[in-house]
């Protein structure tokens, strides 16, 4: 990967000049000027996913200039470097190969002179065997009963991805009940365990190092809960499995290392649901469906690696995002899935994007002079319409939005899905085209009201429009199509990081708080006042000690 400051490129200067021409252009005018706009600014992937980016404040010239930026920052070589297993995560000296985990074509991928695919396939085979035994009831607990409940204990990438995917694909779930515990707040594990039976519960402890504070605190509490009924330490082996690389610590915990599922340092946490970290997904859906999830992602990987930038969906979405973030000053992006099963999708990519591209230092080690990652947020529709859409429609912040919906519902109750999708279509139309004062006044006139009667209220009913959106319409949310959708967003994030000259695959920003927490923890043990911090932190700790 080349370390090129994007703001110093000729393409960036051209985009700044172009922005002056585009900043007041109306989306409605762009549609009026070109009856073929939709067909020119949309694409269908694999007959499964329609991506419509026509309702954006872009022209063909905008895209040409954005593509020139991708070319001048040598995006293509960055993509090749990732797929080739080069150590593009330079601050940790690691390759970045979540694409290897779902490499269904099994072509060799070399890291340090060694093909990683045999090991990837071996872990997948081990996962399949384990899943078949647990789902089929052959795996028995310490009293000889089959497993009914699975508790995944992890945090961050070891929790968000598996939880998102098992929820999104809930229509495919089998008889196993899945539970996810992440927060070190004791309430999370206590409430999760309260209705469960230790005789039929299986715990998955997901921690690469087996030292993550939150995960190991919860794992020890889960083990204590289990042993309070089971009694004998040897029974732990039948009720706990590990997703880890630390065999010594796993064995010391009481887990049989035969039930330890490994992954590698070239798998980043927030890109790890495709690895052994996805064991909870495979247990919930069955291994065949987990393989379909991998296959859907692999299909998008091939599209990303092989399609010219002009028609490459992750690249196009990434460039449009850079356009808003750096030239329009949009600080946030909303992800709005019109599907209740997808209720954790925005949270998942909140981590995926903000932990990846929330960086202020470039790949040369210098502070950047441009915007990097946006703030990501969102909720399912139509709930969001009754919460925060007011600001998106009529507020002073520009919030580009991704609207996501399936054409086919897993729950075709009455006319529910038609009503849901009518809102999905209506919102992007309303955001793009708005409603003028003339239309508002005409509507009032049609109701028989005089201009004097409506003068005081008409301005408040005006919608300026010109709010940009992407629409992603899936045929149906299946393991395959969800895999493709997740990979689309992953590669969008990679593309933005590559162009913006930052390291997307480290996360040093989480370290300082952890270090300070480790220092503060022993200070909370006694009752004596603390004075080793600033006045605010001292006062907060001391008030906590008074009140606890």
Curated annotation (Swiss-Prot):
It catalyses: alpha-D-glucose 6-phosphate = beta-D-fructose 6-phosphate. GO terms for molecular function: carbohydrate derivative binding; glucose-6-phosphate isomerase activity; monosaccharide binding. It is an enzyme of class 5 (isomerase). GO terms for biological process: gluconeogenesis; glucose 6-phosphate metabolic process; glycolytic process. It comes from Serratia proteamaculans (strain 568). It is found in: Cytoplasm. Pathway: Carbohydrate biosynthesis; gluconeogenesis; Carbohydrate degradation; glycolysis; D-glyceraldehyde 3-phosphate and glycerone phosphate from D-glucose: step 2/4. InterPro entries: G6P_Isomerase, G6P_Isomerase_C, Phosphoglucose_isomerase_CS, SIS_dom_sf, SIS_PGI_1, SIS_PGI_2. Catalyzes the reversible isomerization of glucose-6-phosphate to fructose-6-phosphate. Transmembrane segments: none annotated. The keyword Cytoplasm applies. Pfam families: PGI (PF00342). GO terms for cellular component: cytosol. The lineage of its organism: Bacteria, Pseudomonadati, Pseudomonadota, Gammaproteobacteria, Enterobacterales. Belongs to the GPI family. The active site is at 355 (proton donor), 386, 514. This is Glucose-6-phosphate isomerase. Its EC number is 5.3.1.9. Its main location: cytoplasm.
């Amino acid at each position: 990967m080349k370390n090129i400051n994007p703001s110093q490129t000729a393409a960036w200067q051209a985009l700044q000049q172009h922005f002056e021409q585009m900043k007041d252009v109306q989306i409605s005018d762009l549609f009026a000027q070109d009856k073929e706009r939709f067909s020119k600014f949309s694409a269908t992937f694999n007959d499964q996913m329609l991506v419509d980016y026509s309702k954006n404040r872009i022209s063909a010239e905008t895209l040409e200039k954005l593509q020139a930026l991708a070319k001048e920052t040598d995006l293509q070589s960055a993509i090749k470097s990732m797929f080739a297993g080069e150590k593009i995560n330079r601050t940790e000296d690691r390759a970045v190969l979540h694409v290897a985990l779902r490499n269904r074509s099994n072509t060799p991928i070399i890291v340090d002179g060694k093909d990683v695919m045999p090991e990837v396939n071996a872990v997948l085979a081990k996962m399949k065997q384990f899943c078949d035994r647990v789902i089929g009831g052959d795996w028995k607990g310490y009293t000889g009963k089959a497993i009914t409940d699975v508790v995944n204990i992890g945090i961050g990438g070891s929790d968000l991805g598996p939880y998102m995917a098992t929820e999104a694909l809930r229509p495919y779930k089998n008889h196993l009940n899945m539970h996810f515990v992440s927060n070190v707040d004791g309430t999370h594990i206590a409430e999760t365990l309260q209705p469960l039976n230790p005789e039929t519960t299986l715990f998955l402890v997901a921690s690469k190092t087996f030292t993550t504070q939150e995960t190991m605190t919860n794992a020890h509490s889960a083990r204590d809960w289990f042993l309070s009924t089971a009694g004998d330490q040897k029974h732990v082996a039948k009720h706990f499995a590990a997703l880890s690389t630390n065999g010594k610590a796993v064995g010391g915990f009481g887990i049989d290392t035969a039930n330890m599922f490994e992954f590698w340092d070239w798998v980043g946490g927030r890109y790890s649901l495709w690895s052994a970290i996805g064991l909870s997904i495979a247990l919930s859906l069955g291994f065949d469906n987990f393989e379909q999830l991998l296959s859907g992602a692999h299909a998008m990987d091939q599209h990303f690696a092989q399609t010219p930038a002009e028609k490459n969906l992750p690249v196009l979405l990434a460039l449009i995002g850079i356009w808003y973030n750096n030239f329009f000053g949009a600080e946030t992006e909303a992800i709005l899935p019109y599907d209740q099963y997808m209720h954790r999708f925005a949270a998942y990519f909140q981590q995926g994007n903000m932990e990846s591209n929330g960086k202020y230092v470039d790949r040369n080690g210098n502070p950047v002079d441009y915007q990097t990652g946006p703030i990501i947020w969102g909720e399912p529709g139509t709930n969001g319409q009754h919460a925060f859409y007011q600001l998106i429609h009529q507020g002073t912040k520009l919030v580009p939005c991704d609207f996501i919906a399936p054409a086919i519902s897993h729950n075709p109750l009455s006319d529910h899905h038609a009503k849901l999708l009518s809102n999905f279509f209506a919102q992007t139309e309303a955001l793009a085209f708005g409603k003028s004062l003339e239309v508002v006044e005409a509507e009032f006139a049609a109701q028989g009201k005089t201009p004097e009667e409506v003068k005081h209220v008409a301005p408040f009913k005006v919608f300026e429009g010109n709010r940009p959106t992407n629409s992603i319409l899936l045929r149906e949310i299946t393991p395959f199509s969800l895999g493709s959708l997740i990979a689309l967003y992953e590669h969008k994030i990679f593309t933005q990081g590559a162009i913006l000259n930052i390291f997307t695959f480290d996360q040093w920003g989480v370290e300082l708080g952890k270090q300070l927490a480790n220092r503060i923890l022993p200070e909370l043990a006694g009752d004596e006042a603390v004075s080793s911090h600033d006045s605010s932190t001292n006062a907060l700790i001391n008030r906590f000690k008074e009140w606890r």
